[in-house]
Amino acid sequence: MKRRQFLATGTAGLANLSLPAFLCAAPAATDLSQPAPVNPFLDWFGIDEALIRRVMSELTARGADFAELYFQHKRANVIRMQDGIASQASSDIMQGVGLRVVVGDQTGFAFTEDLNPESMLRAARTAATIASGQGATVPAHFDPKRQGDLYSVERPWSEVGLDEKLPLIRKVEAMARAADPAIDKVTVRLTDTDERVLIATLGGHLLTDRRPSVLMGLQLTAKRGGQTQSNLGSLGARSDIGFYTDRRLKDLVDEAVSRTLVLFDARRPPAGEMPVMLAAGASSVLLHEAIGHGMEADFNRIGTSIYSDMIGKPVAESFVTVVDQGDLPHELGTLNMDDEGNATGRAVLVDKGILKSYLHDNLSARHYGLDRDGATHVGSGRRESYRFPILPRMTSTFMENGPHTRDEIVAAIDRGIIAETFTGGQVAIGAGDFTFYVKNGWLVEGGKITAPIKDVNLIGNGPEALKRITMVANDFKLDPGGWVCGKGGQNVPVSIGMPSALVSRMTVGGENV
């Protein structure tokens, strides 16, 4: 398994927090200045049930265990303001359909950006070439269905203009500059999307979802005494412009300013193996990357994950519980349904130290026999866009509260560090070996926090780190920022969180003393 670069959070990583390439505009006859209709695929492109049935028949003409058509239409708007000047303002559209058919262990997949009958039928025939059997029975009728309403908005972002967005961005810049005279440069970027999805399944369901999202990134540069320091913050949700209340904006600015200014007094810690307290919130990036991916079912189905034969076995202390939950209202990782049309929900991966389950798509759920006798798996099949196949993916992944307090954990550290904010790293998904870069943290000596630290490398192994968690606090926090996870060449938004937790030992890359 190749090592891969983790896509970090915040404005400095906004090039990594990019949306898919928008390769196709809507037809000239469509007035995209108007609000999107309830079903744009029908109203804009004439994709009705009869056409869906025709394409599905072609897709499954040589056999199918299951199949789906995944239609997507997505608008994205980006505004970037640097030191009071709008340096970027763009609006893009992507649209298309992905077609998949599964026969046994074989998957046929094709996509087209052209939502006309000829292009879709041609793509269906391409995907169907994997099979050579008798055609599947296509339902005579597709039943409309919705799986939830976890991120309803008063107004979609496609109806919010620059006259409302620019004052919001200018307010954030003014708040940052007023926070401290050392703040020298301020960059604010607002990215919003209005996405429509329509999924037609061989099982006869026709599912729709409207997925809003917004992410504000803030990057600050401060100057003091001949030194220059930079840091960042971000705040995102599946919500509308009303999400950015004065209280939330103040919290975003205060956090970013604090993270930046503390770097003037920070130093690198001593290098070596020592206890590491993972701070509540963003430290869950380590949990997500170094541990969570190993619990995705595709890696376990093919035996490349260290957890492949560990179901029912202890992987952590009894006070450690790890959950992936895709139905937390308005979180960026939340989905009403996954990209196969299955309902999302709460999947307990580690329950009181015991590995209980993996994250599944339809293919792995069938392999593990989960969807039998009326049972259904928690939907975790995701894709970056219609151009990509389905993979089991995390949504909102977190560790639950434990029996300790943060103060008790700090007091238990004789010589170690607190890792507070992360800006990137690498991980080998199967084995879980990792290197993470800590931007902000604290030195702990004799059970007391003694100094801020910066620019720290954490080196270790995810499954081993999970086993070495000896204390978990009761200060759980979901990180409010925007995170994008990369896997198999696909990037999807996720949410992360955890309480403070103590890893008894980890290799810290600092200064040799």
Predicted regions located by residue number:
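N-terminal small-residue-enriched
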Residues: 2-513
